[in-house]
């Protein structure tokens, strides 16, 4: 670090903060990209994650800290404790990312296997390392491909075991969370629409297609294809927007300013 | 043998003599024709000269001489004589000169035959005849063809204006144009035909512009027809046959295409008016004129379609107005009857038009179809066309129907009804309503004639396929079987002394799948009837095990003796009504709630029942208070004072409105049908885009109904949830079938 000029030092710091990688990795990546930060990110993300050795004994200790006294699983209390330890709000979306890494089957509980899989994948075997990885996990949400995976994962994770569809309230909560990350101007209208007109559970198809809709159709609906294969609910949503004057002449009128 | 060598001068001289002689003959001068000696002399001279070897070989010079002579003759005599004249006279002169020329060339070719053969063989020169023709073309034709053409066109125009012209002359001139092309039609086509066509165009353009303003549509068409006929005749008389198509097209264009819109849309005599006033002849003419002009014909067909649609809609509107202005139900029903009749008549009328005026042309069939598809899908006073049509059938088929017709007329009517069905898009709705009505007719013995019922089912089967009618046929068969079954039941009763229902009982067993669905109610049967049910069950179990009987009391009829003070009257009532009345054998006076408790019926049903027995025409029960409506606080008593002049009366129970149930049932059926269609399509295609999937489903389903695209979309999503289909990962508009 001492041999680096100030500019380079700053870049290394930035890199480490954003990716959560170690200094050594940061240097490697930056050198490889001739000290261009963006290039360095590309290099870093395209390389397989360097799995640092995780000590299984430490993992056991960690697991035991959180596991429920009566069942061999981490339940709600354990998760709350974990969040506290991590200094992260239990409602924080990063916990969703954690669950995704664990391939958790349902929210508010982790099996031992899921816990182990997740932490090993992230190269975590201590709380310290766990805390360090938090910013990395946040960054994963910025990746388009990963976000889609996490988003689609969220459906299976958030729904009741044995149900095929996701309860509306839960869905709305998840959407609010997810689209706070990935800014979608119509999310509030969507939620209002569902509560006013739909009042039923959300199918997986509708869930996944909504993301595509948010990604590809512009908020003023100028490139929305009414003859397309969008789920029926989304067609209704567009009608709702038009009927209520929210979209007029392909302009999104901002109601928040109209009161 | 020594042949004398003929010198050049001599030879030329001979030649010239021969040519001159012919010229003189043709000019009409006094000149004796060739005698055989002269002829032979000349012929032989030329012959010998051709055989002469160099230095006496003068064939080339002879040839040249010939050429010069022809040229000279043309230049000095032929051309000036033509030029000297004008117009028709010029044409006559031309024709004469041309004829002469051809004769001359023929004679000369014969005379100088060997020259012809020799030269052409040796040196590939144009034949004498060809040379002669070429000269005529280059010297005469080139010079005069413009004037000739103009003269011809002037004559043609004169003839068009009605004057007599010399047709033979024209034919000859035009033959000349063809012949002068020497094997090609280009002289005729470029120098004459093209200009003639242009002139024709201009001529008819002028005429049409005037006529279109002054004449009515029929008159204009008459004139056009005349003109086109005359032009065709013209070809026969003097134009070359190859001109026919082009000429017709040009004339047609100016007369019929340029002003087509003005013509068809003429305010007081245009196509719409002709249709309105049933001017069949004029319309036939219109068809004939436009049958070769696709654009025009389409316009006529469109007007035809609009006209029929408007008339149909007007009929619907009439019925709608009449229905809404009259308060009572009965009158409204009549209007709807009348409407169907009128639509049938409308259809008959315009089918005739299509066959007669429009010669069965596909465009007009289509126009008719499309018009009726609009008309036959209108709603009248809340009833869909499917329902209206079933009501109509009901009236034709039932005993008390308003349609009193002969058997033949009935057959015809049923045929036409089935034809109309083809236009209705919600055929499944028709089938469902039909089944409901059929059920009523069959079960309440209201059908006029079994044969008629079967007849219409046969016709429906022919038109719509076996699947359409299978349930209905099942229903009719059920009744036949039921009669047999009843006979067996009666035998059973006779031979089984233990089996005593106590009442005369007739049971009709219906096969569940065929009949419309009926709610079986939890009616508490009167004791007398309970026994009947038991006895019948006993009998039925001797016939078949493994079948479950569900009793539909709402469809039953009961004959009850009412022992009134004045006299006993037999009452024909429904089973439900009977159940109510029998309660009064045990109690004098009952409240609404008591009746309710004893019978275990719904409020809706009970109100209807009590109303029919206490507030309608026949008041078998008296009600406290004596109001016209039933309320839950009412009390009822047996009305012993009731009487009627008849000994047997029927107490009608107005039927529940089935419409909502039918629509709901059909809605459910459609969901299944859509589901099945999607699966069928995807199973065979494996992978398919959304739009295509939707359109194939629509096509498959259109036999029975017009599916709502949204409904199809919903079913697709349902199938995705049920894991029959999935979206393609790359392209969300593609679906894959999951085995």
Predicted regions: what they are:
Chain A
Residues 239-259:
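Long, low-complexity intrinsically disordered regions
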Residues 160, 165:
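An amphipathic, hydrophobic-aromatic interaction surface with interspersed Lys/Arg
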